[in-house]
Every structure is written in C-alpha cells, then in structure tokens.
Amino acid sequence: MSIKIIIPSLGESVTEATIAKWYKKLGDAVKTDELLLEIETDKVTLEVNAPCNGTIGKISKTDGANVTVGEEVGEINEIADTDTAWINNKKQEVSQHTSEQLVDKPAMASNILAPSVQKLVTENKLDPNNIKGTGRGGRITKYDVLETINTTPITIETHAINKTNEERTQRVRMSRLRKTIAQRLKDSQNTAAILTTFNEIDMSKVIALRNQYKEEFEKKHTVKLGFMSFFVKATIEALKLIPSINAEIDGDDLLYKNYYDIGVAVGTEQGLVVPVIRDADKMSFADIEQAIGNLAKKAREGKLSISDLSGGTFSISNGGVYGSLLSTPIINPPQSGILGLHKTEERAVVIDGKIEIRPMMYIALSYDHRIIDGKEGVSFLVKIKNLIENPEKLLLNL
C-alpha cells in the first residue's frame, strides 16, 4: 500500500514553501517519524517526517521546487510493523555501503548542503569543510554559514579604477523572506488607512528604577532587566483602555480580542521577523524579559517555529536599538496598530518653568484609521507616556 507524503500546514497565512533538501532517495528504507525532507517558508525551516514504515516509492518534487500546503511530494510503500526487521537490515546495508564509500572521502558529508545553504556558501566563496554544522547529524544550516561570514576577517582587494558596467552592479535574486516582507508591507499600505501619531516620554524615572534594581533583579531571575518589559506592560494597559487598537477588521465585522499576544519585531541577517509573546498580560516583568530573550535568540539562529510567529494582536518595534530617532512604523496585518520606540537622547525640556536636561524618547503609533479614531490613537500614546513616566503605577496596577 502506498502512503502519500504531504506538505503539512505551514501556519497562519503561509501557503507556499520551497523544498530545501531531500534526505532520502528512491528505494531507501524509512521508519515512522524519520526525517524525509526539509522545506523552507518565508519565515522558518520545517522538517517533514515519514508517516509510516516502508521504502521511498516515489519522489514527485525535487530540491528547490516550490510546493503548497497539502501538495503531494512523494510516496512511501508501506511495510507492516512486523517487517521492521527487514527495514533495519536494509538500513544497516546502506549504512555499511555508505561508510565504505566515505573511507577515502571524509569531507564529502559536509558538502551535502541544502540549496539555500549552498547558495550562501557559493556567494561568499566559503569552504564547507571549514564550517562547523550545528544541524541534525552535523549538517550545515544557514545560521552556521552566517556565523562563519560574521567571524571571518574581511579581505579588501585592490582593483583597477576603470570597471565595466557589469562590475559596478550586482544582481541578486530576492530571498523568499525578503519577497514576503516586501509584499506584506505593500499590502498593508494598500489595504489599511494608516495614520501615525507621535508623543515623547521623559525616561528619567524608569531609568532610575532600572538602575536601582537591575543587579538584584538579574540575581533573582537570572535575566537582565531591560526597558522592553516596561513598554510591554504599559502597552497592555493602554490596549485595555482603547480596545479597538487590539481589534481587527474581519469582512464587515470588527473582531475584538480579549487577550494580549504582543509581537516584538526582531531584525535578523535574513530580514525582519515578529515573534509573539503569548498572553503577555499574565506575565511578570521577569517572564516578559525571558520570553523576549528566548525569542530573539531563536530568531537570530533561524530556529523560530510556526507557532512562534503566528497570531499576535499588536506589535512593538524598537528602532532605537539601531539609533533611530523617529520613524513611522508600518502595521503588521491583520493587526490594527504598531508601537514604534526610538533611541533615548538627552534634550533640553521645560520643567516647571525651568530648562532641564532630560533623557527623552519619541514614540510613534501607526494605526488603521478605518477602525481607530484619532482621539483613540492619541489617548493610547498618552496612557503609555503616563505609565512610563510614572513606573510605580505599573507596579501598583494603577
């Protein structure tokens, strides 16, 4: 009996993927849940495992092919559980044969790369034998290649001043992630009536509070106290005050969400991703800092799962970590708002009729004007400003 190998669900709003690499070939024996192939979406790399014991009877989509959810990419000739001894013997024969072939070719295994990984290696003129693989079975992943690139000294070559037009430009095909980012951002602008409102925050008190307790906080919770946990907490309180910003348009209806899954934008070598902190309103400051740290690490290593990226009721983007003074963030559909944070900079401000130097931050709220009125957008930022400038209110739930 033949069992189809089907592309599984890829998560919310993701319907297409690319086959990165098949790890089995026609006739290979496989066991239930054994790795068959890897597929790449615009967000993550996923493994497709064997649905049953048997042998590979058909491969209809090869490496590099584009596939969709539910599409058949091959078949397994099923073997009953009582025949697993035959599979084990078959695997042992293949393993022995492979070992004999590799006796005089120890570097061959490291050169078996997924197309996307091979492309990175080739473009950067790297030797795969010099890259330490951290993937399953020691295979080389995109993250391994990027780490090698980042740690390799740059050699600057001297060229003649006169160059041909071809040498002065370089054409590079957009990655699936970059194409998806471009499409989603353009769709957001074309669909939503985006409006941005601004405010500024005196960061003096929250900085003082953090400096006073950061060492004690880290010692107790084994995670550093940053400013993001304060902003996540303040954002949730502002969303409770203005429920429409935590809602979305669904056809002719407004869908109000009584939960708070906050997306936090993270920049990676591949592009921007927005992993989600689930039920952030139920978390402590330490829980939020831990969640942000874990998600950021997974994002940089390319190990985010579909569930890490799916959903989200509102997003926060902190351009301040890159030195941004002011920006107008773009909404992440189908959400209705996004908060933009920026760098803290000492500026002269008037306090009680006197000019003082204070650490100030500009904040921005981009929102969908179809569902959110201007008054609500302004009130949202004022609430956040009030809580950050008086952080004791966050601690006392005021």
Curated annotation (Swiss-Prot):
One of its GO terms (cellular component) is cytosol. GO terms for biological process: L-lysine catabolic process to acetyl-CoA via saccharopine; tricarboxylic acid cycle. Binds 1 lipoyl cofactor covalently. Keywords: Acyltransferase, Lipoyl, Transferase, Tricarboxylic acid cycle. The active site is at residues 369, 373. Its cofactor is (R)-lipoate. Residues 2-77 form the Lipoyl-binding domain. Its EC number is 2.3.1.61. Residues 112-149 form the Peripheral subunit-binding (PSBD) domain. It catalyses: N(6)-[(R)-dihydrolipoyl]-L-lysyl-[protein] + succinyl-CoA = N(6)-[(R)-S(8)-succinyldihydrolipoyl]-L-lysyl-[protein] + CoA. Gene3D superfamilies: 2.40.50.100, Chloramphenicol acetyltransferase-like domain, E3-binding domain. The modification N6-lipoyllysine is found at residue 43. CDD domains: lipoyl_domain. InterPro entries: 2-oxoA_DH_lipoyl-BS (IPR003016), 2-oxoacid_dehydrogenase (IPR050537), 2-oxoacid_DH_actylTfrase (IPR001078), Biotin_lipoyl (IPR000089), CAT-like_dom_sf (IPR023213), E3-bd_dom_sf (IPR036625), PSBD (IPR004167), Single_hybrid_motif (IPR011053). PANTHER family: DIHYDROLIPOYLLYSINE-RESIDUE SUCCINYLTRANSFERASE COMPONENT OF 2-OXOGLUTARATE DEHYDROGENASE COMPLEX, MITOCHONDRIAL, DIHYDROLIPOYLLYSINE-RESIDUE SUCCINYLTRANSFERASE COMPONENT OF 2-OXOGLUTARATE DEHYDROGENASE COMPLEX, MITOCHONDRIAL-RELATED. NCBIfam families: PRK05704.1 (NF004309), sucB (TIGR01347). Belongs to the 2-oxoacid dehydrogenase family. E2 component of the 2-oxoglutarate dehydrogenase (OGDH) complex which catalyzes the second step in the conversion of 2-oxoglutarate to succinyl-CoA and CO(2). This is Dihydrolipoyllysine-residue succinyltransferase component of 2-oxoglutarate dehydrogenase complex. It comes from Rickettsia typhi (strain ATCC VR-144 / Wilmington).
